[in-house]
Swiss-Prot record:
Family as reported in the entry's similarity comment: To phage Mu protein N.
DNA-binding listed as a keyword: yes
GO MF term list: DNA binding
Organism in which the protein naturally occurs: Haemophilus influenzae (strain ATCC 51907 / DSM 11121 / KW20 / Rd)
Keyword hit for DNA-binding: yes
Swiss-Prot/TrEMBL keywords: DNA-binding, Viral genome circularization, Virus entry into host cell
Span of the signal peptide: none
Domain of life: Bacteria
InterPro entries xref list: DNA_circ_N
Identification of the protein by name: Mu-like prophage FluMu DNA circularization protein
An annotated GO BP: symbiont entry into host cell
DNA-binding region: 368-387
Amino acid sequence: MASKITGKGSFRGVPFLIEEEQGLDGGRRIVSHEYPLRDEGLTEDMGKRLRRYQVSCLVIGDDHLAQAEKLIDALEASGAGTLKHPYFGTIEVRVDDYRAKNSTNHQRVTRFDINFLPAIEKNAPEIAEDTAYSVLSEYQATLNSLSDEFAEMVQDVSGFIESMVDNPLFRLADTTAAFIENIFEGVANTVSGLTEVKDKALSIKNRLSNLLLTPKVLAYELQQLTRLNVRSAVNSQRQFVQHIVITDSISSALGDLTATKNEISKSTLDEMVTAKTNNVAETEILARQFKNLHEQEIFDALMNKTTFLLKRLVLSTLAVEYGKAISDAVTESVAQKTVTEETIATLIESKTDVQRYIAEVDEQLEAVILDNADAEQWTSYAALEQYRLTLMRDLQIRGERLANAIEVKLNDTYPAILLEYRHTGNSKTWKRLALRNGISHPLFCLGGTTLEVLQ
């Protein structure tokens, strides 16, 4: 049995009685286009029109004016409110307009005509965060932080070396040149296709005396030397394999270079700089900080500090560049909205690829973050940690736009073009399937093997 219409309603908890007629307007937003001197025109559907609830109600009684004031206060309050209506039910609405009427013919009554609109909050396009731009901004900020702290500490070290030897600049140049020769030229000799790196390293060595006068410029040059260049999809996979080889080679060379050396802590160096600022003589500072060491051992310790600073700058820059290259590869893959026969297999094509590279770059960044923390280089530590968080967020958000990858185990031998059509409905992308799975002959995808197919 249908429920009885009571004739009672309320808005924001203020009660009223409905009158005979209640209205509801709606429809579509149709725009008509008519042109002069033409007999035809056209109409355009711009979407659904918002419903308009027309409520005719009243309050009655000896205190009807007080009741009317309460309802008016509710109607004029800001924001959405709850309308309870015997016909429309309970809905969240906003007040468009209202009209209150009093008549001498009907005493003890105030009538209202009210127009309500639905309270729809999310009716505008949502602002999407440009995570790729955030990575780009953090990338540059991180490199700047690394070079700033490196330059500051190298300057502090060189200030104490000046008090110990003649021509301290040449001693620093010798240490830095040996570092570049052992690390970059050694890597260029073992990894093919890195003649550009070798030439760049030689150029820096030839200008070291001038570069050490401006350590920030030296840091920039070393960062340029370690930079990865992913120039196109064709060579991106080779570049990333090369990066792994370079990183391993540099890490090994740096490990050998610093294995037998001890590093002066940053807190010790800061104490020395503070004492120097307070006009304490350098010789007195060194004697106080290194009581049990001879002068040559103190000099070696300061030079070793320079080597450790160079090592930390290079490894941190490598990790940052690797993350930037992965973000760029995702950008390239997301940009390929349509896949044709000419589409080239990119480095990162699926959510699975993204997850794999997230784990790899996170591991590399975490290693250099902890290394900087152990060395008390807090500026570099904070910048690297912020970069890591921004990069991880970017890869996770934009990685969701990429295709899913499924593994298919073949029970027979098929051509790649048939497999691609069977699992994606598009045979034009068979080259990508072959490249992704390293298929030597696309006509023979051998039975018993497992292939990864993008959907």
